[in-house]
Amino acid sequence: MPAKPATTDVPRKRITTPDRTVAELIETVPAAAPARGSVRTKARKRALDILFEADLRRSDPRESLTLHTAEADPPVRPLTADLVLGVTERQAGIDALIADCLASDWSLERMPRVDRCLARIAIWEMQSGTSSAEVAVQQAVQLAQELSTDGSANFLNGLLAKVKQRLEGNQN
């Protein structure tokens, strides 16, 4: 199977600031200096920041994306915008899938906010085909080890393995 291109074919919503759309803002972004980690890993981390902020404020992630894009340093890249917009567009379905795969004594609201956002990103990547399920899970687990609680990496690994099984079962 040929490798997927680095960008996705997910159509972008037109999000506007007072005078420019997110797409226009992103296109004006200068090349950033190389930093540690892959481009996709950095995009996931930045998307996590934006989704986490929106979840914390109980606001629309598109508003946070617009603010981060207009005032960003370092700039928001198209891949980050794709992740945020993709998760936002499918969030209700993603959250239902997470809830179905959680143990009976857990709820979506009980999950640490970082874990919830990481799970949403990984599931969107699995559903959209922008990353293989293995890569999406591995990246979510790696970010959980770095940014969340002690047990989060194991928790997310188990949850996302269950989600992966469900998604593969739906394809057959």
Whereabouts are the PLM-identified features?
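N-terminal interaction/assembly modules
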Residues: 1-172
